[in-house]
């Protein structure tokens, strides 16, 4: 909807919250230099972590910065060059939700972050399951190769 309405900044805001999982307070950390590097160093509770940017998002952010004439500093800023406030970010996203006929309660940066976290947890759960299945198959193949195709209880029952 944001692209149709030609609200590229709002489109990128939604995308960065949903794909990178950053908080609104971490938005000033999204600078042209850090986007070029492909990861955002953010502080969470005194701890420093790095948020990787997906290549598609990185390309779109760099294109946006180039079109806006930004060579350094924050990617998301007002016409005056100041960083966007929390209320301004939330208001833009909720206006988009209203235009797209999506519940405004679901169109907050916090909800988009929750979407990111839920999606990530689901992907991690799927990867864990695949790793377990792969490990089980590897053990089965190894047992067949060594000749342990039957369990000791099965051998006793066969005699």
Regions found by a protein language model. Give the residues of each.
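Bulky hydrophobic/aromatic "packing anchor" residues in well-ordered structure
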Residues: 1, 75-76, 117
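Basic, Lys/Arg- and aromatic-enriched nucleic-acid-binding interface segment
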Residues: 1-20, 24
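Residue-level marker of regulatory loop/turn positions in helix-turn-helix DNA-binding domains and
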Residues: 5-6, 16, 85, 105, ...
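A short, glycine-centered helix-capping/turn motif at helix boundaries
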Residues: 16-29, 122-125, 134-135
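Conserved tyrosine-mediated DNA breakage-rejoining catalytic core shared by Y-recombinases
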Residues: 20, 25-60
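Catalytic-site neighborhood detector that most strongly recognizes the C-terminal catalytic loop/helix
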Residues: 45, 131-159
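Active-site/catalytic core of tyrosine-dependent DNA strand-transfer enzymes
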Residues: 54-104
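Short, basic (Lys/Arg/His-rich) helix/loop patches that form interaction surfaces
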Residues: 91-125, 132, 136, 150
């Amino acid at each position: 909807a944001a692209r149709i309405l030609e609200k590229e900044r709002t489109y990128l805001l939604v995308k960065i919250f949903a794909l990178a999982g950053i908080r609104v307070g971490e938005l000033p950390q999204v600078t042209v230099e850090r986007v070029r590097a492909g990861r955002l160093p953010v502080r969470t509770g005194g701890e420093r972590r790095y948020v990787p940017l997906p290549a598609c998002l990185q390309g779109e952010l760099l294109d946006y910065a180039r079109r806006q004439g930004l060579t350094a500093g924050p990617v998301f800023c007002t016409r005056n060059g100041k960083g966007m406030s929390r209320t301004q970010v939330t208001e833009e996203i909720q206006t988009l939700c209203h235009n797209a006929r999506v519940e405004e309660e679901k169109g907050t940066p916090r909800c988009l972050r929750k979407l990111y976290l839920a999606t990530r947890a689901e992907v991690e759960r799927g990867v864990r399951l695949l790793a377990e299945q792969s490990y089980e198959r590897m053990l089965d193949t190894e047992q067949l190769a060594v000749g342990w195709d039957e369990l000791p209880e099965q051998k006793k029952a066969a005699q």
